[in-house]
Amino acid sequence: MRTVVQRVSRASVTVEGRISGAIERGLLVLLGVGQDDAESEAEYLAEKIAGLRIFEDENEKMNLSVVDVGGAVLAVSQFTLYGDVRKGKRPSFDAAARPERAKELYEYFVAQIRAKGLRCETGVFQAMMHVELVNDGPVTILLDSKKEF
């Protein structure tokens, strides 16, 4: 399972002209699910993301988590995180999970984030989405449950 985590001052997802999820201060999480992923990867990433100390404290040091600052999470499914462009110029998505399994694990990840007491807004799985954000910093962290980067 792969994520791109961005610290934001606000973010939203629009599907077919309607906002499906929006947050103010918090984290935008783009989530990709791989073929071999299981619930344990979702649990690991939810724990890691909820505890990431990437918000500044009173001394302007990154020392606070999204929980500490009372922020929220906007989780957006993004299978293209498994795009492989090592051969040719068109990405291959063979390493991405099948849509049915990916949806299960995406929803499980969202449930795990919510179980940590965080408000978690979402996009719409498999929909064409327009993601709008104001990146705060910018601060962007890449996480992979298989620790590949």
Swiss-Prot record:
GO process annotations (BP): D-amino acid catabolic process
Alphabetized InterPro entries for the sequence: Daa-tRNA_deacyls_DTD, DTD-like_sf
Protein localization: Cytoplasm
Keywords in alphabetical order: Cytoplasm, Hydrolase, RNA-binding, tRNA-binding
Top-rank taxon: Bacteria
SUPFAM superfamilies reported in the protein's UniProt record: DTD-like
E.C. number: 3.1.1.96
Any one GO molecular-function label of the UniProt entry: Gly-tRNA(Ala) deacylase activity
Motif (Gly-cisPro motif, important for rejection of L-amino acids): 137-138
Record keyword Transit peptide present: no
Catalytic reaction list: glycyl-tRNA(Ala) + H2O = tRNA(Ala) + glycine + H(+); a D-aminoacyl-tRNA + H2O = a tRNA + a D-alpha-amino acid + H(+)
GO cellular component, one term: cytoplasm
Subunit composition and interactions: Homodimer.
Domain-related comment: A Gly-cisPro motif from one monomer fits into the active site of the other monomer to allow specific chiral rejection of L-amino acids.
Primary role: An aminoacyl-tRNA editing enzyme that deacylates mischarged D-aminoacyl-tRNAs. Also deacylates mischarged glycyl-tRNA(Ala), protecting cells against glycine mischarging by AlaRS. Acts via tRNA-based rather than protein-based catalysis; rejects L-amino acids rather than detecting D-amino acids in the active site. By recycling D-aminoacyl-tRNA to D-amino acids and free tRNA molecules, this enzyme counteracts the toxicity associated with the formation of D-aminoacyl-tRNA entities in vivo and helps enforce protein L-homochirality.
Family: Belongs to the DTD family.
Designated name of the protein: D-aminoacyl-tRNA deacylase
Species name: Koribacter versatilis (strain Ellin345)
Phylogenetic classification of the source organism: Bacteria, Pseudomonadati, Acidobacteriota, Terriglobia, Terriglobales
Gene (UniProt): dtd
